[in-house]
Amino acid sequence: MENSMTRGEMMKLSIVQLLVGLAIAIVLCAPGYGQEDVSKFPSKPITYIVPVTPGTGTDLSVRLIAKEAEKFLKQAIVVVNKPGGALTLGTAAIATAKPDGYTIGFTGGPPLFLTPLLEKVPYDPIKDIRTIMQYGGFNFGVYVKGDSPFKTFKELVAYARQNPKKATYGTVGVNGMPNIMMEEVAKREKVQITHIPFKGTSEGQTALLGGHTIFGAGDFNASLVEAHEIRLLMMLKDEPSAEYPGVPTLKELYNLPYPMYISIITQRNVPDAIVKKLDDAFAKAMKEPAFISGMKELQLPIIYRSGKDLDPYVLQSYNYFSRALKEMGAIK
């Protein structure tokens, strides 16, 4: 007797195998497969990656909000510093993490919309990352020596117009945001200014106080403002500064953006429900007295913005700096 299946039996078996395969594929592709029940999230500690060194103002702000958010998430938040690569090493670790919400991180903005334009990075800032929320901002500005004759930014511009290339200014590095925005302002005002890059904020401020530059742009030591050793002429930010009322912003004077913020990001494919849960917890943490007093001590403004509002701003900033860098000749 021939031990073989008939043609009909083979067809039936093939159909059964096909149906089983389809069923497995549907299950594997179903939303939420392999993910824990959102209602149980988080069921283990969350890793919070910070791409800067420990002890900086940014790092301390992360530790402040993480400590308060633990109360609402009922899980530990482990802060892990991954500095290097102009903040891209830590950002890459967030972008390539498992999209389960257990890896989140800090960004100030540039690793998403500026650095990727200037150098190759191991992530796509738009496709690989999403924002959970913003909880703070920075106080950056344009400043002169305390005894400078310039009392307003317009007076500084007038000097630059009358003295081409003699208005020297310091920032931290070439093609950083302060450098780009000062060149943008110079272009609008049709003046020529001279950029002098420094390795750090303190080095640039020392040069300013020593009379080696006319003005500085970017981060500054708040204690020097309080001691009247430097004078702020313009804030490099979108919103007026509560800490420095009366000082006009770049947005007010030139309608130019300065997208620097303290926000929490995660992998792009983390489910919306988990992102909302994280957003809610960190938003509550912002209202805790310890967080508020801590941010005040760090002299960092508290600003809330949802990821839904911030993500389009990231894309807008990416497009803006792409154009600005091309016009400066920094990229093709």
Q: What is each of the regions a protein language model found here?
A:
Residues 1-43, 332:
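Short, low-complexity disordered leader/linker segments with a strong preference
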Residues 7-8, 43-45, 187-191, 272-332:
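An extracytoplasmic/periplasmic, membrane-proximal ligand-sensing/linker region
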Residues 34-128, 165-166, 174, 178, ...:
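N-terminal (or domain-start) structured segment
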Residues 93-102, 117-203, 250, 255-294:
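Hinge/capping helix and adjacent helix->loop/strand transition within the periplasmic-binding protein
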Residues 108-109, 146, 219-221, 237, ...:
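Short secondary-structure boundary segments
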Residues 130, 229-242:
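Conserved helix-loop-beta element of the AMP-binding
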Residues 207, 242-246:
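Short, charged, surface-exposed secondary-structure boundary motifs
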